[in-house]
């Protein structure tokens, strides 16, 4: 079903920029890297990235709890305190850069990765495994991109890059 929907949208002129995002009229905004922006989100469930700080307002994935989360957010009086966040280590910043860029249709810029982290992304063990499954490919313009099949599995692929420390934080998060 997913692949059929992707094909239908692409046949109708949509550009796939991530697993779930398709844009009909691509602009220069679609070309922006997913790894550099300072992203400040507002609202219930908003997720922000400010340098090495990552934080989010409370959110839920439980349908019956969503209204309560929104009500709690609406009752907040002090928005200057980040209650759900952490400072990312250098390794976490590396993993976040990989996840955010690899999941984005432009892919990961190998030169930028080396500039930031001092080594080639070709040394990333998981990249070799993903290439063997034909889920990623190197492009002529120096990027590592998901293949069409890789994009279909991007929820799974993204999980592979989550470190044990972050996984523990995710598992202990209270919805």
Where do the PLM segments sit?
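C-terminal scaffold of the Radical SAM
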Residues: 1-117, 174
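Ser/Thr-centered flexible coil motifs
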Residues: 87-89, 147, 163
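Non-catalytic, well-ordered alpha-helical scaffold segments
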Residues: 92-100, 124, 151, 155
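Extended hydrophobic-aromatic, low-complexity segments
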Residues: 110-111, 122-123, 138-139
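Short amphipathic alpha-helical interaction segments
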Residues: 117-132
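A short, conserved structural fragment
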Residues: 131-141
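Accessory beta->alpha helical hairpin/"wing" motif in late/C-terminal subdomains of nucleic-acid enzymes
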Residues: 139-157
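Short, amphipathic alpha-helical interaction segments positioned at domain boundaries
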Residues: 151-175
